[in-house]
Amino acid sequence: MLTRGDKGQAVVELQEQLVALGYALPRWGADGDLGNETLSALTKFLADHGRGDEEPYVVAAAELELVHQVYAATAAACPVPVPGRTFYDLRKESDRSNIHGRRPWTQITGITLHQCAVDFGHEKPARWDSLWAQTAASLEGDFFLVHDLQALVWHGHGFNPTDVGLELEGLYAGIAGPPDGSATPQTPTPELIATAQGGIRWIYEQVKRHGGQLRYLHAHRQSRDSRRADPGQELWQAIAIPMMAELGLTDGGLGFKIGSGRAIPEEWNPQYVGSAY
């Protein structure tokens, strides 16, 4: 049972499930504080399911259970499958010091793609739990949920407040071709590409189901000049460009960048004629 004024994770869960079921909380969102907005949304939910609300300032155990049951049935019908050969939920094990707060679902408007610039090795989930991003995909085709999508994680500089970070395992050249440094770049595996694309679909659907809307697919280079090769030409062309076309997303267009970032170059997207690497 919950009472008006209660705070905590149980309230957040109730609020998120109400929003996912179409009962918007436009003023306060899932803030973890059981106030009049959430109680009014619950009253509407109960009415739609043939229940009265005899105690409008109390959420009875039976009412909570009904919300959970309806939400579970809706979630089970989600048309987008969980991405990856194996889906690793590392949220309980991940480094909490990488989380710097939470944001409402409506604030999540994009995904930032990153290259890890390292090969973590074959299927070692424990090595991913310190990642500075919410999600990741491995060369073998595994997907990692490292932090809640609502978690505020320092992964993309100016994109931190609005974007989910998606790390892609491996070291990749900024422009495909002979290496320009001491390290030899890798080639993206088909498993990595497929899992990253599935991950983008899954993140898109999760945000939508919770009342938000993704509009952008960014490269880390767009927010930081020192990330010039992030995520790199091959990953951008194999993952970002097809997914933008499929989901109606944008990278901001020709010349778009924020802060000290660099725009998407012509080498990554031939439509951006004259945009320098």
Predicted regions and their residues:
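Short coil-to-beta-strand
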Residues: 14, 157-175
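Basic/polar, cationic surfaces and motifs that engage anionic cell-wall
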Residues: 47, 53-94, 100, 105, ...
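Short acidic, glycine/serine/threonine-rich helix-capping segments at coil-helix boundaries
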Residues: 2-71, 215
